[in-house]
Curated annotation (Swiss-Prot):
Domain of life of the organism encoding this protein: Bacteria
Name the UniProt record assigns to this protein: Protein nucleotidyltransferase YdiU
Family membership noted in the UniProt record: Belongs to the SELO family.
Active-site residues from the entry: 252
Binding site for Mg(2+): 253, 262
Family matches, as Pfam families: SelO (PF02696)
Length: 485
């Protein structure tokens, strides 16, 4: 029996109006082969733990042979890119293959990135290169390990197909899994095209599939938007707390369910630099690290405008007004956890602000600082103080911090243990990703495999991987990444 017959597969998105997508067959790569396979995620969907155990997996997921249970399609959407509306967007190199149910009965999209040209490719070749595919695979799993809402990576395939970017590279494929691939830009496309019947139908389906609790409400569309605002605020609060810069927060890269989506020129902070720009095409710093909360609101406002045929302006405004309150609440909660604080006290915001100021002024590594702080008590303050150039200012802050901790009436051991569970020892620094890419391009996937294992449990000590916690070398700091992928 074919493996595809044993899985719970469907193609419900293809039941939507055809102006939302185009059926496109994948264009196979040469000599395609597995590079990575996410065993834990595969198990969740009743897929084999070893992809080599069934040749149909490679031929089907790579697009060489399209199983009858698949219905490959490229989605049509629009979006605001760097603040300007662009109606000519869509899946230019990715295809939604099918939807699959996990063991709990939840439905997930299976999306193949790098599958070839589509009607929405514009001048692109429809391919993804190994370099960018490795980055997305690693980062989506790193974000999952950090507990941040994200799409997932099920597998990665390599090939011998040459793909030209700044120079010749090899084509690769990413199997992305997500609860949905509906973006803010889907609603923008229908709204600006004045396709209001289809616009309402998409909203109805999104509520049915992803916000079923809204169905019993008198105004399900307004409740859905409230939920989108809340989830987006929560996602961005997580980004800011862990030091993640997305790099290209266009509305077509915003998930309707608040999951981190479309990993491109992302970066994690090394030194705490609020204005960090990871995308070298972002000349104005629109998507700088410290601008992400503001851009989240801008994008939600764009979505609100696109949903205005369904929701009263007063309801939209009320939801948008809650965004900053929600984001600040989530962020403050996350920072209290990172600092080992249980209760909410009046001076906490100032404690956080003074910490960020001190980190920025002294160019202190953000991840290293919080991990070291997870081991601080009155007997080993010096380890933290030594991270700073201005040691007097650091000593004063540490003293204030310890005084604040003493108000919690919790043992030092208990506090430190909880802090180590939320402050990662390991993050996907750009230089680590680059080292894995360099080796993979030579056919050595050992670094990729090691990082994948490590980033799934970034809070553990992993003594055998200690060197991955090292600060970046000079060449690896403040790397700006191209959108070219």
């Amino acid at each position: 029996m074919s493996i595809w017959n044993s899985l719970s597969l469907s193609t419900r998105y293809s039941e939507l109006p055809p102006l939302l997508f185009t059926h496109v067959p994948p264009q196979p790569l040469n000599n395609v082969h597995w590079i990575m396979w996410n065993e834990k995620l595969a198990k969740r969907f009743n897929l084999p733990l070893d992809p080599a155990a069934d040749a149909e997996l490679l031929s089907g997921f790579s697009g060489e042979v399209v199983p009858p249970q698949f219905s490959p399609l490229a989605m049509k959407y629009a979006g605001h890119q760097f603040g300007s509306y662009n109606p000519d967007l869509g899946d230019g190199r990715g295809l939604l293959l099918a939807e699959i149910k996990d063991k709990a009965g939840a439905s997930f999209d299976i999306h193949l990135k790098g599958a070839g040209r589509t009607p929405y490719s514009r001048s692109g070749d429809g391919r993804a290169v190994l370099r960018s595919t490795i980055r997305e695979y690693l980062c989506s799993e790193a974000m999952f390990g950090l507990g941040i809402p994200t799409t997932r990576a099920l597998g990665m395939m390599g090939s011998d197909t040459p793909v030209y970017r700044e120079g010749y590279e090899t084509g690769a494929l990413l199997l992305r899994v997500a609860e949905t691939h509906v973006r803010f830009g889907h609603f923008e496309h229908l709204f600006y095209s004045n396709l209001l019947a289809e616009h309402k139908l998409l909203a109805d389906k999104v509520i049915e599939w992803h916000f079923p609790d809204c169905l019993d409400n008198e105004n399900p569309y307004a409740v859905m938007f409230n939920e989108i605002v809340d989830r987006t605020a929560k996602m961005i609060a997580h980004w800011q707390a862990v030091g993640f810069a997305h790099g290209v927060m266009n509305t077509d890269n915003m998930s309707i369910i608040g999951q981190t989506f479309d990993y491109g020129p992302f970066g994690f902070l090394d030194d705490y630099e609020p204005g960090y720009i990871c995308n070298h095409s972002d000349y104005q710093g629109r998507y700088a690290f410290n601008q992400q909360p503001r851009i989240g609101l801008w994008n939600l406002s764009a979505l609100a405008h696109a949903l205005s045929p369904l929701i009263d302006k007063a309801d939209l405004d009320q939801a948008l007004e809650q965004y900053e309150v929600q984001l600040h609440g989530y962020f403050s909660q996350l920072m209290r956890q990172k600092l080992g604080l249980i209760t909410k006290q009046d001076g906490d915001s100032r404690l956080f602000e003074s910490m960020f100021e001190l980190l920025s002024q002294n160019s202190v590594d953000y991840t290293r600082f919080l991990r070291e702080l997870s081991n601080v008590d009155t007997h080993n303050e010096q380890a933290i103080i030594d991270l700073f150039i201005d040691r007097d200012a650091a000593k004063l802050w540490v003293s204030l911090y310890i005084t604040r901790c003493e108000k919690e009436h919790e043992t030092v051991a208990s506090r430190c243990k909880k802090m180590r569970e939320v402050n990662p020892k390991y993050i996907l620094r750009n230089y680590l990703a680059q080292q894995a890419i360099d080796k993979a391009q030579e056919g050595d996937y050992s670094e990729l495999e090691a990082l994948s294992l490590l980033l799934r449990s970034p809070f553990d000590e992993h003594i055998e991987f200690e060197h991955y916690a090292n600060l970046p070398p000079s060449w690896g700091k403040k790397m700006e990444i191209s959108c070219s992928s």
